Amino acid sequence: GASLFVLSPMVLARSFYHPALAGQWIILLGILLVIETPRLKSAGHLTAVWMIVLTGAILIHPYFLPMMGVLMVLSAVRLIDRQGWSGRYRWRALVIMTIVPAAVAVGIFYLVGGFSLGTGAEVYDLADKGFNLLSFVNPLGYSVLPAFPNRSISGETMMWLGLGVWLMLFLATWLWRGNYQVTWLRLRRYWRRHHWICRVGLTVSMLLLVFAVGVRIDVGPATLVQYSVPKPIYELWSAFRASAREAWVFYYTTIL
């Protein structure tokens, strides 16, 4: 099972031309922390753990920070929901448990000279390096597989899940047949019981997806829509100009 992650096309490609971004184990660690959140004893414990993880992530490569930030929010809302906090208290706890680790991580990154070479925001190519909605199914010529037409020519959009993962997904879908209605009812029941955590989690996940897609929404070779945002937002966004990378957390969640 570990080979599905270690030998994934995306990691292998990164290992040969961008080793820092091959350190995607940090994403798996973040997902594990979200799953294991109930084992964390308190808000202070969670804050300390994510402070260490976020600092490690940004020192490996700043592109990991937005993804890990979203996972941190999911972990925090899980703890808040488990503790049964409500009203303003839970929002206050959420802000503290997320802002403090992020501020410490960015502060340490600044102290080690992380901003000394600039932000890269002067390069405006968000449209060409955004996440294509068919990236998971397009091999882009990986190994002996053919490449399907793709709107972008950037290699950043290569997120082929791998033939083994797709076979596994099709097999799981076939084995799951007849249980879709039961699963849907369970999801609805969970939503009613934990509507706050579900809404917050869905919101931050959608925001990360929008961030990854960029200012041009592509589906294979076609562009559905291209939009503009105010210049200050665009410049800040352009600091993560290869925004497709922010979809890596969805990549690994799909495999899991």
PLM region spans:
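Membrane-embedded helix bundles of polyisoprenyl
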Residues: 1-38, 43-80, 97-105
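Membrane-water interface of alpha-helical transmembrane segments
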Residues: 36, 44, 54, 58, ...
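Helical transmembrane-bundle signal
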Residues: 5, 33, 68, 72, ...
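Membrane-interface helix-loop junctions at the exits of transmembrane helices
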Residues: 1-17, 106-117, 133-144, 199-241
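Membrane-embedded alpha-helical segments of multi-pass membrane proteins
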Residues: 21-30, 69, 161-164, 246-254
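Short aromatic-rich membrane-water interface segments that cap or initiate transmembrane helices
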Residues: 10-13, 58-61, 145-159, 232-247
